[in-house]
């Protein structure tokens, strides 16, 4: 875990958050970004959480409330934090547009180097919790577990350029969430069909099927 006085880059903190689910890394990132948002803030973490909720709302997440940066919901963090499968999928879709995030969640293992308060450097190795990574088009994901939420997992799949985002909430065991994820992805790709919206021998100048004939006077 991170100790007071440790120094690391934002990307290293992101790796510590996303690969081994480091709640300490989530807090560090929240405090750092919160101060960037408002240098005068007296509570950088609260400033960051406020920005989280505002960003979620802009994405169309109507069923989400964040109360802390790491997602824990018990003891000192107990409250009304919640989300939905739909909202988590929206957030995953948006996050996967970021190249750094995309590369981090696609990492099977990684390491970060942290400079301690005494100036010494020490390395931390990390292994992903995503046991599906690299299988059947799985290109990344994030686990989450609490007693109230159960075993959760959101992931991204890409098969032949068709990318989808899956969300499993409140699964019964850590293994079951991965089984459910694979089943969900396989169902989608197995039931996907291509439907021709035009069936005609006539083609337009660029080779596409002719959809309709409209007289020149109809355009005026």
Located regions from the model:
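Domain-terminus/edge residues, biased toward the C-terminal soluble/receptor-binding domains
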Residues: 61-62, 77-220
């Amino acid at each position: 875990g991170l100790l007071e006085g440790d120094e690391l880059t934002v990307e290293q903190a992101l790796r510590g958050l996303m690969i081994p689910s480091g709640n300490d890394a989530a807090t560090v990132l929240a405090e750092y970004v919160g101060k960037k948002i408002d240098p005068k803030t007296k509570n950088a973490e609260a400033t960051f959480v406020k920005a989280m909720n505002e960003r979620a709302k802009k994405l169309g997440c109507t069923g989400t409330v964040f109360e802390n940066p790491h997602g824990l919901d018990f003891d000192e963090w107990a409250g009304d934090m919640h989300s939905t499968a739909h909202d988590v999928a929206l957030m995953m879709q948006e996050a996967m547009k970021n190249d750094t995030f995309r590369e981090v969640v696609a990492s099977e293992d990684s390491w970060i180097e942290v400079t301690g308060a005494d100036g010494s450097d020490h390395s931390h190795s990390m292994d992903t919790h995503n046991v599906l990574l690299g299988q059947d088009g799985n290109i990344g994901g994030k686990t989450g577990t609490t007693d109230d939420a159960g075993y959760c997992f959101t992931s991204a799949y890409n098969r032949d350029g068709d990318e989808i985002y899956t969300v499993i909430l409140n699964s019964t065991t850590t293994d079951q969430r991965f089984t459910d994820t694979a089943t969900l992805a396989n169902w989608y790709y197995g039931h996907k069909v291509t439907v021709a919206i035009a069936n005609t021998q006539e083609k337009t100048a660029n080779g596409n099927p002719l959809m309709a004939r409209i007289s020149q006077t109809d355009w005026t």
